[in-house]
């Protein structure tokens, strides 16, 4: 419906997507093909299949449609634009060292400092640090999305299946509190090695 409505618009149109909705992201290809610009914080379209990533960028270029997703990685720092500029100059980064998840960094710091894992998750959620569904963070899905967007912006043709992560929670655990003992043990193991969780 939106595409049909936008087809009659004489003025340039920009769609701003501040959701985490795949249903909204599913419209990107049609909107770009219609000449609409897109500004998005939604990671789903850019972190899906590599073929989808390439289609979106090809459509944006072919139709002169601005396509901006800077806020998907780095909390709106001008990181992706800088990476793309390096690639355009032939100086593509070959390595990144980064904290890709502020929420996971916060969680691990709280657990390291003695808070139970479940309490740290509740606190991070109350502070608005996690995704609306904290499993996106705890199962590292949000982190993988950021990594894919960053790597693809640097020219790497990665598929989601090529990224290996260790989720912070066991999907089979009936409740988050079931993870407290595991994380307490991990803190003690790290401390015994003179290390910290990070």
Residue ranges and their predicted role:
Residues 38-39, 66-67, 131:
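Hydrophobic beta-strand scaffold residues
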Residues 61-64, 68-127, 141, 149:
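Rossmann-like NAD(P)H-binding beta-loop-alpha module
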Residues 110-111, 118-198:
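Substrate-binding/catalytic subdomain of NAD(P)-dependent oxidoreductase enzymes
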Residues 7, 16-20, 48, 71, ...:
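Catalytic cores of large soluble enzymes that bind and process phosphate-bearing ligands
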Residues 21-34, 43-70, 75-86:
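Rossmann-fold NAD(P)-binding glycine/threonine-rich loop
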Residues 1-33:
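N-terminal glycine-/serine-/threonine-rich beta1-alpha1-beta2 phosphate-ribose binding loop
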Residues 32, 39, 98-99:
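Short conserved micro-motifs on helix faces and helix-strand junctions that flank
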